[in-house]
Amino acid sequence: MDPSSGGGGGGGGGGSSSSSDSAPDCWDQTDMEAPGPGPCGGGGSGSGSMAAVAEAQRENLSAAFSRQLNVNAKPFVPNVHAAEFVPSFLRGPAQPPLSPAGAAGGDHGAGSGAGGPSEPVESSQDQSCEGSNSTVSMELSEPVVENGETEMSPEESWEHKEEISEAEPGGGSSGDGRPPEESTQEMMEEEEEIPKPKSAVAPPGAPKKEHVNVVFIGHVDAGKSTIGGQIMYLTGMVDKRTLEKYEREAKEKNRETWYLSWALDTNQEERDKGKTVEVGRAYFETEKKHFTILDAPGHKSFVPNMIGGASQADLAVLVISARKGEFETGFEKGGQTREHAMLAKTAGVKHLIVLINKMDDPTVNWSNERYEECKEKLVPFLKKVGFNPKKDIHFMPCSGLTGANLKEQSDFCPWYIGLPFIPYLDNLPNFNRSVDGPIRLPIVDKYKDMGTVVLGKLESGSICKGQQLVMMPNKHNVEVLGILSDDVETDSVAPGENLKIRLKGIEEEEILPGFILCDLNNLCHSGRTFDAQIVIIEHKSIICPGYNAVLHIHTCIEEVEITALICLVDKKSGEKSKTRPRFVKQDQVCIARLRTAGTICLETFKDFPQMGRFTLRDEGKTIAIGKVLKLVPEKD
């Protein structure tokens, strides 16, 4: 019998496979030790001794598996150099020397039990001389547990899945199909390369860096995901090998220039079409700050997703394509450049970096004239939206595909004298966030995972493990069981961080995006009716009382009706009209009463700007932006 296939069956199958292919080494040894009669037995005593043998076999197997079985183990890779090593669970109390089959089985046990083919085995081998058998088994099991708990485990398991599919097209035993040294070498490379991002995500004992959410916005195909992927590579969050793998896959699909964006577009559909749909998330670090990239979709069908991303952002990066024709398409009416910039301002983004991308394109060739032309067209519009060109906006040229001017000064644009993109981000002044303010965490998403887990950005206040909170507007009392900040477990968090919080006392079905986690003693306001100042951005016809639209406020999306128009506001002087208007039209500002279909959480803009500014959308267009002035109590 082939020992490698037998070992594979024993390591993976547990008790489900037949006697012919389940851990043959243990069965042989037990048979050798059993003093019972021949195969055909001798009446009652024969059956008794066979029962005893079966019992001993069962105990042996269950003891072995209960101690060492690891469902997350890496795929079995034979290691020819470790044949002499036998783990403690295969040595019986007083056992004769093992047969070659047993040694092969032992070799397999080492490979699968340790979770890695060579390095963990060698370390435990050194220590087996000093300690007892139990020490060895501890040494074997510990790396597995650590591996399971690291924050990088999603990426690791994904890498291994890839490896299994490549190495074992026709079942488990094909591990012998190529030289074991080669596969072992590959696995060792894997071990060395994966932990790199780990230290970047959670440096132990280091002072906590300020956390900043950056949303990449702009027209479809301006290069947002490519720049995001390039930043991930330049800051060491994606290794060269992974990037080369994306490049190979992109070439196979004739999408050669898209490979960088695949670091953020993880969904297969997004990769095939080259369009971001969801808001992609990724992390990178500079010397002073920890950044989360929110890569917003640029296509107009996905603007609601983009609003969700912008509502969590501290800083927006507007990506513009300098390529002839592309800039004009994105900026003219119908393009997303205008709408995205406006929505970012409405969502509360104070600082805007405008990256003029694709400067390496043959139609541009790092032309200063083209750069200035794009800048001249953008400034008046951004000023109109509400950004201050001197304080809030910073322009810079770059190439997402080559990485020019992202981390280091580029020789291609000697005319640009500012800092490159990543150093500029690192030197931004700190954001003022209220640690002492009331707890406000708007829910972005929720899912089940050993309880109910909610996702969101903590806007103000601080949360710690074991704290009692309230989920508004339903007034559900909940307890915080665990907190993950950017997938790293922590006991307490400050404002501005992206969190996953495990809650007790509420079911996942009882939560909707737009709900707010609050302090017991300081609940947020909730209701259906409020007065607001709104600016009509784009609407062909007039808007009268009774008009319906979709309200986007913080992470909440709800249907809303304008029930009454109270007065018009003069744009320049701010004076309010004495009479009630019968309608409003494009470019006018008015104060109106709005009523939502369901109860929502909101605050006045004056008290809490993040929960007091909103957008009205209709038929796929942004109709108006506004701010909440007054909450109107419900009539019973």
Swiss-Prot record:
Gene Ontology CC entries for this record: cytoplasm; cytosolic ribosome; translation release factor complex
Entry protein name: Eukaryotic peptide chain release factor GTP-binding subunit ERF3A
One GO molecular-function entry: GTPase activity
Catalytic activity: GTP + H2O = GDP + phosphate + H(+)
EC number annotated for this UniProt entry: 3.6.5.-
Similarity field: Belongs to the TRAFAC class translation factor GTPase superfamily. Classic translation factor GTPase family. ERF3 subfamily.
Chain spans, region G2: 274-278
Annotated Polar residues bias: 121-138
Residue span of region G3: 295-298
Residue ranges, compositional bias (Acidic residues): 183-193
Database matches in Pfam families: GTP-eEF1A_C, GTP_EFTU, GTP_EFTU_D2, PAM2
Chain intervals with Gly residues compositional bias: 1-16, 103-116
Annotated gene: Gspt1
Stated role: GTPase component of the eRF1-eRF3-GTP ternary complex, a ternary complex that mediates translation termination in response to the termination codons UAA, UAG and UGA. GSPT1/ERF3A mediates ETF1/ERF1 delivery to stop codons: The eRF1-eRF3-GTP complex binds to a stop codon in the ribosomal A-site. GTP hydrolysis by GSPT1/ERF3A induces a conformational change that leads to its dissociation, permitting ETF1/ERF1 to accommodate fully in the A-site.
Disordered as annotated region, ranges: 1-54, 90-206
Annotated region (G4), positions in chain: 357-360
InterPro entries: EFTu-like_2, G_TR_CS, GTP-eEF1A_C, P-loop_NTPase, PAM2_motif, T_Tr_GTP-bd_dom, TRAFAC_GTPase_members, Transl_B-barrel_sf
